[in-house]
Amino acid sequence: MSTVNVQIGLHELLNGSNAQIQLSVPQLVEKVLMRNEGKLTSTGAVSASTGKYTGRSPKDKFIVKEASVADKIAWGAVNQPISEEHFNKLYTKVLEYLKEKEELFVFKGFAGADRNYRLPIQVINEYAWHNLFVHQLFIRPTEEELTTHESEFTIVSAPNFKADPAVDGTNSEAFIMVSFEKRIVLIGGTEYAGEMKKSIFSIMNFLLPEQDILSMHCSANVGEEGDVALFFGLSGTGKTTLSADPNRKLIGDDEHGWSDNGVFNIEGGCYAKCVNLSHEKEPQIFDAITFGSVLENVIINDQTRIADYNDTTLTENTRAAYPMHAIDNIILPSVAGHPNTIIFLTADASGVLPPISKLSKEQAMYHFLSGYTSKLAGTERGVTSPQATFSTCFGSPFLPLDASRYAEMLGEKIEKHDAKVFLVNTGWTGGEYGVGKRMNLGYTRAMIQAALNGELAKTETAKHDIFGLEVPLHVPGVPDEVLMPEQTWADKAAYKAKAIELANEFKANFKKFDSVSEDIINLGGPIA
């Protein structure tokens, strides 16, 4: 199937009598309720369930192996190849399936807040609530922009279309396929809305580096003096929570680009975890869940329609999607200068990493490439308790290119703009998972505040005798004993054994980076 034929098929779909293009938020909410796709909550948000797929399905994600990208993609377990023949046949079947639907919902918008680098996109949805989701998550065009909008990438989403693995070359009924040549994302068999968001992120992670822009899985905010901070970390490590600071303006909560001009948000909304959400803990997120927002897999009371954020009956990966303007202290457009401070967030299930450490450039490169954290319950199917993992660049599932490409760009930018880098453990303290407890959020906020305001630049540090990290001895608002993880363990010998075990895991994982400079290994990694 040629690119021309792909475009003809899209044109027919978009011009069919069933295509509802660029509906407003109230119209989409009405459609969701009329079609019985979701319920209205007491705050006016739409609550929808995603069925059995309550998280991403990494094993069902494919990139079409096309001549133009075959030698650029880092093929493997993350970037699984699928043939053009399989894609073309499945694409044709999905289009025929969607043509028969009474209604289709189309959103046109952008990815990338910096006008110099934004990607015009369109999303064709089988579900109205999915269209509401992308309306809130991506960048919405003005009426004037809409008149000249020409999509450069299209998502075609058909959750109720099930693939046949024996025929379609998939691993299950679900599929998320990206064709860079045809500029199509094809999604089916899963109702999890996050697949649409992350597909566009994966695409930007391919396109932006070609323009010498570092694409990053991070949140970002900016202080009153224009100082920019980045927060890296996988789902559930605290990116959204910790960057929602009442004293700083939010640039974005999850996906950014770093160009020669500075930092820009890739999205136009936020996709926040809301398990155990309360107004007391996270007022910005709690208050953002208003009319037009989307709640995913959140249980609501049948009579009062009040959301119960503590109920994890469906999944722990409950989510809220809302536009940037639902938060008070944001910066719009979502662009800012170069980062002054970079925070690497890790949820260390072994409980041995310090709650905060200062990193040299080499250590920053090492820990960026390592991307150590723990997979937390619910962010992927089948994960019900924390599992130690190394996710390269804190975003391995979304990186189509070789990891060294992103790491080299980060190292260059850290050096050029003199950014200060810190490793922050939001995981366990006083013992490993099951023995210790989760790090106190108030302490984490105090440590990050000290990093942002420059206090940690002048505080005394001690070198960790196993990881070689520089650990501050004093942080305002944090008990000194919390800063040195060994002090929080009752059994000091057990701590040392566990720390050495983790250090060895770091070393074993790093062996896969055979083209990395010796300086990064010798000066950046564990010393014991």
Swiss-Prot record:
HAMAP family: PEPCK_ATP (MF_00453). Gene3D superfamilies: 3.90.228.20, Phosphoenolpyruvate Carboxykinase, domain 1, Phosphoenolpyruvate Carboxykinase, domain 2. GO terms for cellular component: cytosol. One of its GO terms (biological process) is gluconeogenesis. It comes from Bacillus anthracis. Keywords: ATP-binding, Cytoplasm, Decarboxylase, Gluconeogenesis, Lyase, Manganese, Metal-binding, Nucleotide-binding. Binds 1 Mn(2+) ion per subunit. Transmembrane segments: none annotated. Mn(2+) binds at K198, H217, D254. This is Phosphoenolpyruvate carboxykinase (ATP). Belongs to the phosphoenolpyruvate carboxykinase (ATP) family. It comes from the Bacteria. It is an enzyme of class 4 (lyase). Pfam families: PEPCK_ATP.
